[in-house]
Amino acid sequence: MAEKRHTRDSEAQRLPDSFKDSPSKGLGPCGWILVAFSFLFTVITFPISIWMCIKIIKEYERAIIFRLGRILQGGAKGPGLFFILPCTDSFIKVDMRTISFDIPPQEILTKDSVTISVDGVVYYRVQNATLAVANITNADSATRLLAQTTLRNVLGTKNLSQILSDREEIAHNMQSTLDDATDAWGIKVERVEIKDVKLPVQLQRAMAAEAEASREARAKVIAAEGEMNASRALKEASMVITESPAALQLRYLQTLTTIAAEKNSTIVFPLPIDMLQGIIGAKHSHLG
């Protein structure tokens, strides 16, 4: 109850002065007479007239009551049960649920002179039912048109690269701009999303060619770096082998093993001369 009372007080504070006045200050003598007759008619025809006076609105709705064309003091009524006087009172229902709509594709010229087609989606709801009825003829239609112009105005100040990379930030800026513009209508813009950015076919081909060239350039750089690293490793290995003859012989044996494994063959090679000389010398010394 406290929350509902706070909402009605805030609505009353935001209304123009003509809406804040009590109906008794603007009805005039004739209006008072009509209200009195309506009340007497209700009393005389009771309980039949009670069915004309009782109205019920759903949880997600609010009712704006007009008495002889003037909005009653207190703001929107509901949800639940409320009463009106027959003949003098009328009311309008306002749906308070969140509404979404698509922004049609808009042809936009970016800051760097590129023509693109952009569409989006907007989520909004009625925050103040009284303002939505009293200050605007059709809040939904006005919000849709304003969303289209806001999309063109915001994206027209951005480069193509910014539009493609900063979509969330641009959508947030649009949401803030729309929310401020529709505040006087009692509308709360909750979210804006940019759905699709369509580029011209020629620009798409140019961007694809640029991306392919960039990939090829990176591949060539990687291959060149690999060759450079391999040459450095070979240079270091050759220096080590040159300094150690035993390492050269070991490498020779490893190469023969690899060749034999690949060809599935047996390779016969003579023993090194220095090894034979060592064996013969050891035998002679043993016999002597």
From Swiss-Prot:
Spell out the InterPro entries in the cross-references: Band-7_stomatin-like, Band_7, Band_7/SPFH_dom_sf, Band_7/stomatin-like_CS, Stomatin_HflK_fam
Q: Which residues lie on this side of the membrane: Cytoplasmic?
A: 1-25, 55-288
Note the subunit structure: Homodimer and higher order homooligomer. The homodimer is banana-shaped. Interacts with ASIC1, ASIC2 and ASIC3. Interacts with LANCL1. Interacts with SLC2A1. Interacts with SLC4A1; this interaction positively regulates SLC4A1 activity. Identified in large complexes with SLC40A1, SLC14A1, SLC29A1 and AQP1. Interacts with STOML1; may redistribute STOM from the plasma membrane to late endosomes.
Report which gene this protein is encoded by.
STOM
Intramembrane region residues? 26-54
> What happens after mutating D274A?
Reduced oligomerization and lipid raft association
List the expressing tissues: Detected in erythrocytes (at protein level). Widely expressed.
The family this protein is said to belong to: Belongs to the band 7/mec-2 family.
What is the recorded phenotype of mutating V268A?
Complete loss of oligomerization and lipid raft association
Top-level taxon: Eukaryota
Instruction: Name the consequence of T266A.
Output: Complete loss of oligomerization. Reduced lipid raft association
> What's the name of the protein?
Stomatin
Q: Which residues carry this modification: Phosphoserine?
A: S10, S18, S161, S244
Originating species: Homo sapiens (Human)
Localization of this protein: Cell membrane; Cytoplasm, Cytoskeleton; Membrane raft; Melanosome
Hey, what's the signal peptide range on this chain?
none
